[in-house]
């Protein structure tokens, strides 16, 4: 499926005269959106797709916020002191990322990318 997705990305890019990276980014956003629906709350999801192979990884992210600010969105934020328990050199504004299960591309990626481009 990954190779087929890359062929579809190339076809949409040519058909709509849009740079390939823009279409690839749209597919990543579509997959992230589909993954978010698997979670309760306002989670932050990032998908990274290899532009050469079509392989992709999905990550759940937490924004590191200052302790005094408190957590406004516990599903997508982590306090600085707690974050430093995991990563000593992390700073405010950085993200903690942990891999999560990726949703299959299927039609979701293709259709959502097309909608973003249109």
Region spans (language model):
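Charged, low-complexity terminal tails
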Residues: 1-118
């Amino acid at each position: 499926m990954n190779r087929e997705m890359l062929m579809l990305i190339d076809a949409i890019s040519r058909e709509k005269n849009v740079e390939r990276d823009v279409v690839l980014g749209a597919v990543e956003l579509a997959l992230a959106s589909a993954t978010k629906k698997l979670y309760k709350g306002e989670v932050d999801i990032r998908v990274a797709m290899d532009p050469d192979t079509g392989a992709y990884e999905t990550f759940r992210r937490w924004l590191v916020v200052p302790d005094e600010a408190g957590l406004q969105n516990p599903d997508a934020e982590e306090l600085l002191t707690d974050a430093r328990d995991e990563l000593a050199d992390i700073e405010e504004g950085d993200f903690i990322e942990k891999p999560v299960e990726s949703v299959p591309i299927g039609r979701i990626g293709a259709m959502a990318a097309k909608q973003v481009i249109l």
